[in-house]
Amino acid sequence: MVPTSYYVLLSAILFTIGVLGVLLRRNAIVIFMSVELMLNAANLALVAFARERLGVEAQAIVFFVITVAAAEVAVGLALLVSIFRTKRTADVDEVSTLKG
């Protein structure tokens, strides 16, 4: 049986990769994927702790977070496609939707 600390370490590494992707990349799709990686890292940590102590309640929370992440994917991709169609770029530095 794999110890919980390994899952938590993997979760921390994945979350760090996601944070670095958000901070260092300028492509909107890569930033979006990095945010999803951060959500999945948090889910992995929660499941690891639930496996050891919390039980079914934490697994229900993970299911809810996955549902919210799926909705975020749908809305986020729709926004990215819409912005790409109007601006013809996915670079967040070149796209400023607040300008007229």
From Swiss-Prot:
- Keywords assigned by UniProt, alphabetized: Cell membrane, Membrane, NAD, Quinone, Translocase, Transmembrane, Transmembrane helix, Transport, Ubiquinone
Top-level enzyme category: translocase
UniProt function note: NDH-1 shuttles electrons from NADH, via FMN and iron-sulfur (Fe-S) centers, to quinones in the respiratory chain. The immediate electron acceptor for the enzyme in this species is believed to be ubiquinone. Couples the redox reaction to proton translocation (for every two electrons transferred, four hydrogen ions are translocated across the cytoplasmic membrane), and thus conserves the redox energy in a proton gradient.
Signal sequence coordinates: none
UniProt similarity note: Belongs to the complex I subunit 4L family.
Q: Which PANTHER family did the record assign?
A: NADH DEHYDROGENASE SUBUNIT 4L-RELATED, NADH-UBIQUINONE OXIDOREDUCTASE SUBUNIT ND4L
- Indicate what this protein is called per its UniProt record: NADH-quinone oxidoreductase subunit K
> What is the protein's membrane topology class?
Multi-pass membrane protein
Reaction catalysis annotation: a quinone + NADH + 5 H(+)(in) = a quinol + NAD(+) + 4 H(+)(out)
- Biological process GO annotation list? ATP synthesis coupled electron transport
Please provide, alphabetically and separated by semicolons, the GO molecular function terms listed in this UniProt record: NADH:ubiquinone reductase (non-electrogenic) activity; quinone binding
* EC number from the UniProt entry: 7.1.1.-
Q: What is one cellular component GO term in this UniProt entry?
A: NADH dehydrogenase complex
This chain's source organism reads Chloroflexus aggregans (strain MD-66 / DSM 9485)
> Coiled-coil stretches, from where to where?
none
Q: Transmembrane region positions? A: 4-24, 29-49, 61-81
Gene (UniProt): nuoK
Cellular location(s): Cell membrane
Quaternary state and interactors: NDH-1 is composed of 14 different subunits. Subunits NuoA, H, J, K, L, M, N constitute the membrane sector of the complex.
Q: Which InterPro entries match?
A: NADH_UbQ_OxRdtase_chain4L/K (IPR001133), NUOK/Mnh_C1-like (IPR039428)
